[in-house]
Structure formats: C-alpha cells, structure tokens
C-alpha cells in the first residue's frame, strides 16, 4: 500500500475505533436521549455521520473514477499527508460552532443500533473507496468543502477522521448532559 494512503487510513481507523468505544461506553438508555431541545442525541450524531460519510464516500469514488478515466498519474510522493492537513485543529475545536447542511441533519428516529449499523456500512464503503485509490496521485484531485474550502482527496479522508473525533466529543458531552 502506498505510504500516503496507509497514513490517512491509519488515522481514519484510529478515529473510527475511538468513536466506537465512545458510543459503546454510553448506556443504551442514554443513546437516544437529546441533551436539550433541538440538540442531537448520541444516536442522532451517529446518524449524521452515516449521512456525511455516505456523501464523502460517493465523492471519493466518483472523483477517483473520473481521475482514472482522465489518466491520473501514479502517486510518487511519499511525504506525510497529515503534516500538511491544516483543517485538523479547526474541526477539532468544539468551541467553534460548525453548522452542517440540512441534508446531513439526523431525523433522530433510528434506534441506536440501526444508526450505528448505517454508519458502519457508510464508513466501510468510504474506506473501500480510499483503498481503491491506492497508488493514484489523489492529492491532485481537489474538491471544495463548504466550510473549509478546497481539500485534496487525502485531506478529505483526514477530514472524515477529524469529523469522527469531533463528534465523539459531542457524544460524550450529550451523554453527560442527560
């Protein structure tokens, strides 16, 4: 596996595992409870992540397929992706409110297990799309993020990991408040 893909997948896998431990540490009876009117329950946060990762997985698959068709070069760069990922501190800052698009807001009617299963499936599909891009110079493919601006596909994968970490903290906060 190309070192840059391996690096972002290692980060992504670590954040996924941490999120799973956080969610599983919440008592079952608290997973569907919102901490305040209009706030997302832990299961609602997971439902949001399922929606977002479905969209980003589709984005990566589509952009990589288009890159292949247009002759995207093989990856020759072995430098660290994470050292150039400047969005990480911004997304990790829970004091900075970031409002997601309405499309990715949870309906909050899924049972916690159903929400987790939807998220796990979306995450697996996204991860598979990243593995499928192994060996290609996906740092050359740039797509705008609605809040953080242009990100290359490596940075999109790092964003997903940071997004999971941000929401793991939100889940801890929500569970503590109910």
Regions found by a protein language model. Give the residues of each.
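Extreme N-terminal tail/first-helix region
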Residues: 1-17
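Charged, low-complexity, helix/coiled-coil-prone segments
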Residues: 1-5, 23, 57-75, 100-117
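Hydrophobic packing residues in well-ordered alpha-helices of helical domains and bundles
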Residues: 5, 12, 42, 115-119, ...
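Acidic/histidine-rich alpha-helical segments that form the ligand environment
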Residues: 15, 22, 80-137
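Short, flexible helix-adjacent loops and helix caps
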Residues: 24-31
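Short, contiguous alpha-helical
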Residues: 32-90, 124-178
């Amino acid at each position: 596996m190309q070192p840059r893909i391996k690096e972002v997948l290692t980060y992504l896998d670590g954040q996924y595992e941490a999120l799973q431990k956080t969610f599983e540490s919440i008592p079952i009876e608290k997973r569907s409870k919102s901490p305040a009117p209009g706030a997302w329950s832990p299961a609602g946060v997971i439902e949001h992540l399922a929606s977002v990762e479905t969209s980003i997985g589709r984005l990566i698959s589509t952009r990589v397929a288009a890159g292949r068709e247009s002759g995207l070069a093989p990856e020759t760069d072995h430098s660290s992706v994470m050292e150039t990922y400047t969005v990480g501190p911004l997304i990790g800052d829970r004091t900075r409110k970031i409002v997601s698009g309405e499309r990715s807001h949870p309906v909050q009617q899924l049972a916690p297990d159903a929400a987790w299963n939807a998220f796990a499936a979306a995450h697996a599909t996204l991860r598979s799309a990243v593995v499928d891009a192994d060996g290609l110079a996906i740092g050359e493919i740039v797509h705008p993020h609605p809040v953080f601006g242009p990100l290359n596909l490596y940075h999109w994968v790092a964003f997903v990991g940071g997004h999971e970490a941000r929401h793991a903290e939100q889940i801890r906060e929500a569970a503590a408040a109910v």
